Amino acid sequence: MRIFVFVLSLLGLLVGCNRSNPTYEAFFLDTSAREDFALSDIVESVDVLFLNETDDVLVGKVSDVRYANNRWCLLDVDEGRSVVSVFDKEGNALGQLNRQGRGPKEYLEIASFDVCPKTGDIYLGCYPPKVMVFDKELNLKREIECEAPYMGIAKCDDGLMLYGFVARDSVGVDYMKLGSGEEVSVERVKSWRREKNATETIGKNTFMRSAENIYFYTQNSDSLYLANDGNLSVVAAIDYPNREQVRAYRRTHSIYDLPPMERKEYFVPRVHYAMERGGGLWLHYSNVLFGYGVVAKEGVKNYSSKCLDATSLCGNRLVNIVEAFHYDPENFDPNGWLQGVKVNHIKLNDKQRESGNKVLIIYNLRD
C-alpha cells in the first residue's frame, strides 16, 4: 500500500465573508497515522428530496450540482446532452437551460458551470470557447467570447476564476474581471504543463465551494488552492513516494499504455472535494475522507474514514444523486455508519419509485 504524505498549510481556515487570505501554519501529516471518526462528527442530518421531473425538465446523468437562492441547479452532460435543470427547494421543476446549437447565443457543450450564491445567476464555461451568463429565470444576460475553452469556472466577488487550456501543452487558471457594461479583462494567474493522462472530466468543476470559500484542485498540480478574485493560495501541498519520477513519467507517457498491474505505481492523489470543519481541513479522495488538523477536545488530531459517495459539495452540504428505484431507507442504518445522524426519510409511492426520477441525498454538515 502506498502512503501519501501531505504538507498542509492549515489553521486559520475560518475565513469571513470579506474573503481576506487567512494565515496558515505549515506542517507535515502522514495519512498512515490516523484515527477513525464517526460521520456524525461532521454530518448533522440527512435530507432526501424527490425531484418532480416533467416532460420539459427531464434529468439524465448529473455531473455537478449547485444550490443557491433556494434552488437546486443540476448540470447534465452525457452523450451529446448538455443542459442545466433547475428545481425549487421542494423538488418542483422550475425550468431547464438548453441552448445547444451552432448559432449565436447557443453552445455545443457545457464544460463547467457555477451559480452565484448572491444573485442566483448561472455561469457556463462552454464550447466553442465562451462564457455565458443567465439570470435565475434562465434569460441570457451576457455572452463573452474566449480564446480557449474553460473546464472549470467559479464566480468570485468581482469576476470569474477560470481553468482550462492556455496553450497547446499547458493548462492554467485565468481571472476574468467583469466590469460595467461589456468591459472584460483577463489575466493569467497560474499555469502548469499538461500531463498526457490528466483526467479532468467535462462537466465536473475543478473549483469547489465550501461555506464562504472556493477551493481549486487539478490533477496537473499536487496542490490544493484557496481561490478568490485573481489569487490562488496554497492550502495543501501534496507529497508522495517517488513524486518527481512519477510526475516526469506522466508528463511524457500515458499510464494506460502500461499493463494494469503496473499503472498503480504512477497513480497520484485526486481530491474530489475539500471542506473546512472543526478548525481544520477535510479532503476526500479514493472514497476516503481525511480530516487534517481538526481541533478535538484532546487537541489537534488527524482522522480518516471510509466516506459516503457524494456527487458535489454545495456550500455546507454534500449531495449524492440516485434514481428513485435505488432509494432504500434501509441503507441508512441509524445503528451503523450513520449512528448519531438524524435522517429525514421520505416515503415514495409505487408511481414515484417506478418513474426513474432522481432523488437527492443531502448530507447537511455541522457548523
Regions found by a protein language model. Give the residues of each.
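C-terminal motif of bacterial Sec signal peptides marking the signal peptidase cleavage site
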Residues: 14-16
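Blade/loop signatures of beta-propeller domains
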Residues: 20-51
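Beta-strand-rich domains and repeat architectures in extracellular enzymes and scaffolds
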Residues: 47-82
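Blade-loop segments of beta-propeller domains
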Residues: 52-56, 92-119
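Short coil/turn segments at the loop-to-beta-strand junctions that recur within blades
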Residues: 55, 98-106, 145-151, 189-195, ...
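Repeated scaffold domains used in trafficking and secretory/extracellular systems
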Residues: 61-64, 108-113, 148-155, 198-205, ...
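Asp-box/WD-like beta-propeller blade repeats and closely related beta-sheet repeat scaffolds
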Residues: 109, 125-169, 185-195
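Conserved blade-ending motifs and adjacent loop-strand segments that build the rim/top face
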Residues: 236-259, 290-323, 327-328
